[in-house]
From Swiss-Prot:
Taxon lineage: Eukaryota, Viridiplantae, Streptophyta, Embryophyta, Tracheophyta
Annotated positions binding [4Fe-4S] cluster: 559, 568
Protein name from the UniProt record: Photosystem I P700 chlorophyll a apoprotein A2
Residues the record lists as binding chlorophyll a B1: 654
Binding-site list for phylloquinone: 671
Gene designation per UniProt: psaB
Length: 734
């Protein structure tokens, strides 16, 4: 008999129903559950799949470069980055006739094109790329890396090149190599690129392989490095009148601490960024030599952890047993990695707009909005994944004997206190924030806006003042003009910072008021509730008072029969499922807030946000409705416009989102009956009945239907907001 899908599970392959396909897809990546899996094969499969992942990433970025070089307008855009719209790629087959062709022919193109809102043009321009040839070269290089990754993945599955489990579990060596190699050497290499290619390009000097060895990045060469006069590299920076990409007003410094932004590009100084990467490189190169490997010097992580026993015994046996627990659990390691990556991704969102690193990106408002929203959503999914794998760790990998009375065991011991405190915080935030919003709504409805409860965020304003924002008049730390820190800041460190923070044209430390106070607490409610659901899901994954033997049922189970007073919806998977809705909800509020505040800032009518954001009707009317009006008006008697495609996507996003509810709100029996009816009709319809299927159609399980519903809900939600965000921003700022 031919092997049927899924090959990794003979039990499933013999299932006569369509369950075989669904369960096969669901468990394809759950290597631990596959037939004949050993620990060694598990690690090797994961290792090989990393190479595949890298190949996909390199291929994707190569495609970006290739399509812009082929169909974009990079060389034209460089001449006037503020007024030429960057083209992502051509549209091969514009539907809806001539009006559509005209609507989408822009950015100086000959035919219909898509505009790039990803910031790649600004990025490539900043790092020194200048011609289409440069882009093609980059695309080919990444294609080569992609092929190399695929070969690497294949190679490490061959018997001779398969790494052993002991190699995968050598934590010290891995940490050393990742710190020194991944972070240290790559940061050093990037500093090299900035100093040798990007900074000269910003000063009008075109450095490529043919003249790479002849052009000195600094007039004094390596002299100052070897004589210890490092300050020479910071002397004579670019002036405030410097025109980016030309020698006009340029200096010779390569490593500076100017602070603030380049006046023309509104982005961080390239020489500051080179300095930053050099510092990071040195830090990580040192960090990558700290752990004990073959040479018997340096720290052993196990010894470090075992030594962590707090005085007074208040945390029991401290970190004893943690080393082996983490080192032997892939889920624990993945959970830690995802938690770190999630935080970093959210920080990227925050810093890309407040401290823009790429030339002219701060003036490309749609790109700013798209990048912020994109990174916040990605961060949300990654963070929920961290807790999901934390829960799987507790179910599959946690060994109570190994962790007796250490910090991990103690988390489980007092989980009720943790969960109840989080619950209390969520309830407090929710009722108080909603109470304030609703009170203000009622006051406006009754025509007495002066009776609103408006709370100034004085603590946040104080923190902003401490960093140098003077408009609140707090006169503290860096905003105190006669303090030593303020005076030192003018000359020794970051002289540009104080002028940047008090400029009103950037997004640094935006002025905040009562509307910000309220939405901040709404977001805090979302964060705490999402965390509550995720933490409870993980801490109760092994068992709860209602169901002490939960871990025997695995990560996801629908119900445990009618006993125990009802055990539906209490698996660790159900917690993850519920948390994703709250995560999307929270990031919705975050992105609404960011977008509305910035739209009013860019349009120069900040009072609209300040006055309308203190009550819910203001958000619904002056943000959502006002900004979606162009989208709801996509097709009208005047024909197509360039927003029509977003209007269609806005509708389509709502459709996908609403389809989610068909799977989320249902009961099981009627699905099966519906399927039987459809199958019956199919078999009795001429022509259609020529097509037969081998598997008996069965309805999705409860858990599967929830997953399908969740996927539609999430995708539709994000599609809808993406269309709204891009159309409302690009419609205003061209």
């Amino acid at each position: 008999m031919a092997l049927r899908f899924p090959r990794f599970s003979q039990g499933l392959a013999q299932d006569p129903t369509t369950r075989r396909i669904w369960f096969g897809i669901a468990t394809a990546h759950d290597f631990e559950s596959h037939d004949d899996i050993t620990e060694e094969r598990l690690y090797q499969n994961i290792f090989a799949s990393h190479f595949g992942q890298l190949a996909i990433i390199f291929l994707w970025t190569s495609g970006n470069l290739f399509h812009v070089a082929w169909q974009g307008n990079f060389e034209t855009w460089i001449q006037d980055p503020l007024h030429v719209r960057p083209i992502a790629h051509a549209i091969w087959d514009p539907h809806f006739g001539q009006p559509a062709v005209e609507a989408f022919t822009r950015g100086g193109a000959l035919g219909p094109v898509n505009i790039a809102y990803s910031g790649v043009y600004q990025w490539w321009y900043t790092i020194g790329l200048r011609t289409n040839e440069d882009l093609y070269t980059g695309a080919l290089f990444l294609l080569f890396l992609s092929a190399l990754s695929l070969i690497g993945g294949w190679l490490h599955l061959q018997p001779k090149w398969k790494p052993r489990v002991s190699w995968f579990k050598n934590a010290e060596s891995r940490l050393n190599h990742h710190l020194s190699g991944l972070f240290g050497v790559s940061s050093l290499a990037w500093t090299g690129h900035l100093v040798h290619v990007a900074i000269p390009a910003s000063r009008g000097e075109y450095v490529r392989w043919n003249n790479f060895l002849n052009v000195l990045p600094h007039p004094q060469g390596l002299g100052p490095l070897f004589t210890g006069q490092w300050n020479l590299y910071a002397q004579n920076p670019d002036s405030s009148s410097h025109l980016f990409g030309t020698s006009q007003g340029s200096g010779t410094a390569i490593l500076t601490l100017l602070g603030g932004f380049h006046p023309q590009t509104q982005s961080l100084w390239l020489t500051d960024m080179a300095h930053h990467h050099l510092a990071i490189a040195i830090l990580f190169l040192i960090a990558g030599h700290m752990y004990r490997t073959n040479f018997g010097i340096g720290h052993s992580i196990k010894d470090l952890l075992e030594a962590h026993i707090p005085p007074g015994g208040r945390l029991g046996r401290g970190h004893k047993g943690l080393y082996d627990t983490i080192n032997n659990s892939i889920h624990f390691q993945l959970g830690l990695a995802l938690a770190s990556l999630g935080v970093i991704t959210s920080l990227v969102a925050q810093h890309m707009y407040s401290l823009p690193a790429y030339a002219f990106i701060a003036q490309d408002f749609t790109t700013q909005a798209a990048l912020y929203t994109h990174h916040q959503y990605i961060a949300g999914f990654i963070m929920t994944g961290a807790f999901a794998h934390g829960a799987i760790f507790f179910i599959r990998d946690y060994n109570p004997e190994q962790n007796e009375d250490n910090v991990l065991a103690r988390m489980l011991d007092h989980k009720e206190a943790i969960i109840s405190h989080l619950s209390w915080a969520s309830l407090f935030l929710g009722f108080h924030t909603l109470g304030l919003y609703v009170h203000n709504d009622v006051m406006l409805a009754f025509g007495t806006p002066e009776k609103q409860i408006l709370i100034e965020p004085i603590f946040a304003q104080w923190i902003q003042s401490a960093h140098g924002k003077t408009s609140y008049g707090f006169d503290v730390l860096l905003s105190s003009t006669n303090g030593p820190a303020f005076n030192a800041g003018r000359s020794i460190w970051l002289p540009g910072w104080l002028s940047a923070i008090n400029e009103n044209s950037n997004s640094l430390f935006l002025t905040i008021g009562p509307g910000d106070f309220l939405v901040h607490h709404a977001i805090a409610l979302g964060l705490h509730t999402t965390t509550l659901i995720l933490v409870k899901g993980a801490l109760d994954a092994r068992g709860s008072k209602l169901m002490p033997d939960k871990k025997d049922f695995g990560y996801s189970f629908p119900c445990d029969g009618p006993g125990r007073g009802g055990t539906c919806d209490i698996s660790a998977w159900d917690a993850f499922y519920l948390a994703v809705f709250w995560m999307l909800n929270t990031i919705g509020w975050v992105t609404f807030y960011w977008h509305w505040k910035h739209i009013t800032l860019w349009q120069g009518n900040v009072s609209q946000f300040n006055e309308s954001s203190t009550y819910l009707m203001g958000w619904l009317r002056d943000y959502l409705w006002l900004n979606s009006s162009q989208l709801i008006n996509g097709y009208n008697p005047f024909g197509m416009n360039s927003l029509s495609v977003w209007a269609w996507m806005f509708l389509f996003g709502h459709l996908v989102w609403a389809t989610g509810f068909m799977f989320l709100i249902s009961w099981r029996g009627y699905w099966q009956e519906l399927i039987e009816t459809l199958a019956w009709a199919h078999e009795r319809t001429p022509l259609a009945n020529l097509i037969r299927w081998k598997d008996k159609p069965v309805a999705l399980s409860i858990v599967q239907a929830r997953l399908v519903g969740l996927a539609h809900f999430s995708v539709g939600y994000i599609f809808t907001y993406a269309a709204f965000l891009i159309a409302s921003t690009s419609g205003k700022f061209g």
